[in-house]
Amino acid sequence: MRPEDLQDLSLLGQKSVPYIFEYTPDVLEAFPNRHPENDYFVKFNAPEFTSLCPITNQPDFATIYISYIPDEKLVESKSLKLYLFSFRNHGDFHENCINVIGKDLVKLMEPRYLEVWGKFTPRGGISIDPYYNYGKPGTKYEKMAEHRLFNHDLYPETVDNR
């Protein structure tokens, strides 16, 4: 990695990093993709995502799956972790959390393709699994996003195989 690729990363390597538990997209950081000529997926699994129900103020728990095909930038993983932590005391519905995460990542990276899938644990006997995706307009990734959305989760799992 070239030193100039790291100059905008302020969180990685810091021993005392403040953990912010209110929604804070400003904590997200990106670095240059050194292989923009390649199409490849980057995937993150965040099994300890927590937010609050905006009505009851009760905690909601989820595993968040983020997959993207980068263009010129990649998200720095520690900043992503801190960003996801920032939802801890944020009151919002599951569907909105996933859409906000997706839109914030698109704004940060301008990826070729991105998807965010939240698999929330059941509350009141129902689990909610919102899915967001994005394909760069005017490219093959826009069609890819449409195809993946239309074919997403055709075979939903049962409660015992979550």
Swiss-Prot record:
Pathway: tRNA modification; tRNA-queuosine biosynthesis. The active site is at C53 (thioimide intermediate), D60 (proton donor). Its EC number is 1.7.1.13. Pfam families: QueF. InterPro entries: GTP-CH-I_C/QueF (IPR043133), NADPH_dep_7-cyano-7-deazaG_red (IPR050084), QueF (IPR029500), QueF_type1 (IPR016856). It is found in: Cytoplasm. Gene3D superfamilies: 3.30.1130.10. Substrate binds at V75, E76, S77, H94, E95. The keyword Cytoplasm applies. Belongs to the GTP cyclohydrolase I family. QueF type 1 subfamily. Catalyzes the NADPH-dependent reduction of 7-cyano-7-deazaguanine (preQ0) to 7-aminomethyl-7-deazaguanine (preQ1). This is NADPH-dependent 7-cyano-7-deazaguanine reductase. It comes from Exiguobacterium sp. (strain ATCC BAA-1283 / AT1b).
